[in-house]
Curated annotation (Swiss-Prot):
Residues annotated with Phosphoserine modification: S117, S123, S233
Gene: Sh2d4a
Record-linked CDD domains: SH2_SH2D4A
Highest taxon above the source species: Eukaryota
Function: Inhibits estrogen-induced cell proliferation by competing with PLCG for binding to ESR1, blocking the effect of estrogen on PLCG and repressing estrogen-induced proliferation. May play a role in T-cell development and function.
Chain intervals with Basic and acidic residues compositional bias: 163-190, 212-231
Gene Ontology cellular-component terms listed: cytoplasm; cytosol
Source organism: Rattus norvegicus (Rat)
Location(s), subcellular: Cytoplasm
The keyword Coiled coil is assigned to this record: no
Coarse class of the protein's main subcellular location: cytoplasm
Domain spans labelled SH2: 316-408
Region (Disordered): 141-190, 202-282
Protein name per its UniProtKB record: SH2 domain-containing protein 4A
Keywords attached to this entry: Cytoplasm, Phosphoprotein, SH2 domain
Length: 422
């Protein structure tokens, strides 16, 4: 299953929805590893095709190239924002970005108002010149009379009279200075008000909180997935039913086919033979038929669905169930209840688990003649029963602490796995 996903680099959205957050993180990590591996293969093939090593390639004139910075481990140097003690917190960065945006917006508004003010001042100057010309024309006769009177009074000595031009220039400078101060004060007040509105906006605050919570959750899940991956990598083969990942899964010798299974009856109902009972089957799609054929041909020889030391079907085993049906079966149980069902989407299994928060679903990879949770292929089990026994004491994930405590059995008859064993 994992091999198929990595070869196609695609996972069905419905199948992805069944994965837990931890399995999603591990799957994305695996897919990224596969992308890097393919990229390296293509680069090596291209270098061989060009038959020139990378270092000895002739450089073009004025050619540009990119060189990645390498860390102490000789790998590409990566800086994860927010994890270094010198990095600014997320909310501080948001505040600085918003303040910078509002400052730029206020500067643009100030330039626009300055241009409008300059245009208005120019229009006032034109009007003032027109008024002055009209006043000069009207006062020309009076100036002639005043000039004659001034010539007669030359004997009395010169007299300093303030001109109207000096008063006008002084008044104009004061007005311009006052307008400039008012404009600057208005810009500062507007910038502060816009920034205050942004800070007090409830929708923005809610969006910021959600973004921070999502970042924290992703960081926590990624960290937890890495810890689980490392923890399971260090275990190796440490008990019955486990396989060493370094040497690869050893293909077991197929045992003889088990006898006809002893079907478990629903709780509270008397034993009833199913030998002569007619079973009403619904029409199945080609995908479901392929899954049934796969189970009979490839899984029955490995005693899939059987209890570990008997020929009885395990109480936690179910047939092809939908996600909705699995949730309904678990809804009547208590936290720690679980069941393993044949997936309706792929050739594999899904473990449905009831926790305090609700139902969780983990895909089980059965593609390598062994059983392991999707992505965590370092710890593989020879049978489904071994996987269940192991996780009765060892949690599936360190974060969720999922222990398989109470198997969820059949609630209807005939059992939902009947078509798999016929």
């Amino acid at each position: 299953m994992l091999r198929q996903i990595l070869s196609e680099m695609f996972i069905d959205p419905d199948l992805l929805a069944e994965l837990s957050e931890e399995q999603k993180q591990i799957l994305f990590y695996k897919m990224r590893e596969e992308q890097i591996r393919r990229w390296k293969e293509r680069e090596a093939a291209m270098e061989r095709k060009e038959s020139l090593p990378v270092k000895s390639r002739p450089k073009k004139e004025n050619g540009k190239s990119v060189h990645w910075k390498l860390g102490a481990d000789k790998q590409v140097w990566v800086w994860v924002m927010g994890e270094h003690h010198l990095d600014k917190p997320y909310d501080v960065l948001c505040d600085e970005i918003l303040a910078e945006r509002e400052h730029l917006r206020a500067a643009k508004d100030a330039e626009l108002r300055k241009a409008q003010s300059l245009q208005f001042t120019n229009s006032l100057k034109v009007k003032s010149l027109n008024c002055d010309l009209q006043a000069v024309k009207k006062t020309e006769p009076q100036n002639v009379t005043r000039k004659a009177a001034a010539e007669e009074a030359t004997d009395q000595g010169p007299r300093a009279i303030p001109t109207k031009k000096d008063d006008k220039a002084q008044t104009k400078d004061l007005t311009k200075k006052k307008d400039s101060e008012e404009l600057k004060q208005t810009e500062d007040e507007k910038t502060k008000q816009i920034y205050k509105n942004w800070k007090e906006d409830s929708e923005w605050q809610a969006s910021l909180r959600k973004s921070k919570a999502a970042d924290e959750k992703r960081r926590s899940l990624a960290k937890q997935a890495r810890e689980d991956y490392k923890r399971l990598s260090q275990r190796g083969r440490s008990g019955d039913g486990l396989q060493n990942p370094l040497t690869g899964p050893q293909k077991p010798k197929r045992p003889p086919l088990p006898p006809k299974p002893q079907f478990l009856q629903p709780l509270g109902s008397p034993p009833k033979s199913l030998g002569n009972q007619g079973v009403i089957r619904t029409k199945t799609s080609s995908t479901q038929e392929d899954i049934i054929r796969w189970f009979k041909e490839e899984q029955l020889p490995f005693r899939a669905g059987y209890q570990k030391n008997s020929d009885t079907i395990a109480p936690w085993f179910h047939g092809i169930l939908t996600l909705k049906k699995a949730n309904e079966l678990l809804s009547t149980g208590m936290p720690g209840s679980f069941l393993i069902r044949v997936s309706e989407k792929i050739k594999g299994y899904a473990l449905s688990y009831l926790s305090e928060e609700g139902c969780k679903h983990f895909l089980i990879d059965a593609s390598a003649n062994s059983y392991s949770f999707l992505g965590v292929d370092q710890l593989q089990h020879a049978t489904l029963a071994d996987l269940v026994e192991y996780h009765k004491e060892e949690p599936i994930t360190s974060l969720g602490k999922e222990l398989l405590l109470f198997p969820c059995g059949q609630q209807d008859k005939p059992p939902d796995y009947l078509e798999l064993f016929q």
